[in-house]
């Protein structure tokens, strides 16, 4: 199943996780660099107010729901129960189901902490994944130098975790120069992924309450994203 719904007048692609996994494996097997945006409420708000930015994000091959809050008017619980992509955590499902397990990933992040957490998360999702490199992005960084650094590693997957707005503009501006097969942007919703990397306190572990703790952490992350 692959359809779309209007959220704040933006077309959001809707598909099952099975279809998503199939598409990602297809993207990783062709020679074109495909761009996947996991959308946040902030991204959609910005696109509503800035036509030029809207034109930028509409260049993406897929705009997927990056957080469940986007689908609050579309019975998100039913969609999730039906195996639909409802947040950026489906990227983890994709990594788990890579046809070629030793794909390489290069990470561009906002901070060294987030880069390290994303590296840990990616390897947990797919132990066979090769971490080809990473960089903490600086707006003053020379674009040509960064692009050369990425291209020297020729990653299969370019995972981008930057601020909403600059992230999408940077990707689309430099898309023709990048040597990768798949670019996945998660900057506006990365907290949903990083929440899974927060280790439970010792007292929680002793009481064997890790699943409940992880659920509460995820819910708190969603609330923060909605309030933002």
Where are these regions (language model features)?
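N-terminal nucleotide/polyanion-binding subdomain common to many enzyme families
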Residues: 1-83
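Structural motif
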Residues: 36-38, 64, 157-161, 184
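Short glycine-rich anion-binding loops that position phosphate/pyrophosphate groups of nucleotides
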Residues: 41-43, 69, 162-166, 189
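A short, gly/pro- and small-residue-rich
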Residues: 53-59, 168-190
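Conserved beta-alpha
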Residues: 70-143, 149, 153
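Short, flexible loop segments at boundaries between secondary-structure elements
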Residues: 137-141, 179-213
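Proline-aspartate-enriched helix->loop->beta-strand connector
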Residues: 150, 154-164, 180
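A charged, well-structured terminal subsegment
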Residues: 212-228
């Amino acid at each position: 199943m692959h359809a779309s719904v209007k959220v704040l007048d933006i077309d959001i692609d809707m598909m099952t996780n099975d279809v998503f996994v199939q598409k990602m494996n297809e993207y990783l097997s062709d020679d074109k660099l495909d761009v996947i945006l996991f959308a946040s409420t902030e991204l959609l708000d910005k696109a509503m107010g800035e036509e030029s930015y809207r034109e930028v994000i509409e260049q993406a091959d897929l705009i997927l729901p990056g957080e469940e809050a986007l689908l609050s008017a579309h019975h998100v619980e039913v969609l999730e129960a039906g195996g639909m992509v409802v947040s950026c955590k489906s990227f983890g499902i994709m990594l788990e189901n890579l046809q070629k397990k030793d794909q390489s990933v290069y990470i561009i992040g906002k901070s060294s902490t987030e880069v390290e957490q994303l590296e840990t998360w990616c390897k947990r999702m797919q132990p066979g994944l090769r971490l080809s490199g990473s960089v903490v992005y600086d707006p003053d960084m020379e674009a040509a130098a960064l692009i050369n650094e990425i291209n020297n590693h020729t990653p299969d997957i370019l995972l981008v975790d930057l601020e909403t707005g600059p992230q999408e503009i940077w990707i689309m501006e430099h898309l023709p120069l990048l040597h990768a097969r798949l670019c996945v942007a998660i900057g506006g919703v990365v907290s949903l992924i990083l929440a899974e990397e927060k280790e439970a306190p010792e007292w929680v572990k002793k009481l064997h309450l890790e699943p409940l703790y992880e659920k509460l952490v995820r819910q708190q992350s969603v609330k923060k994203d909605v309030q933002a």
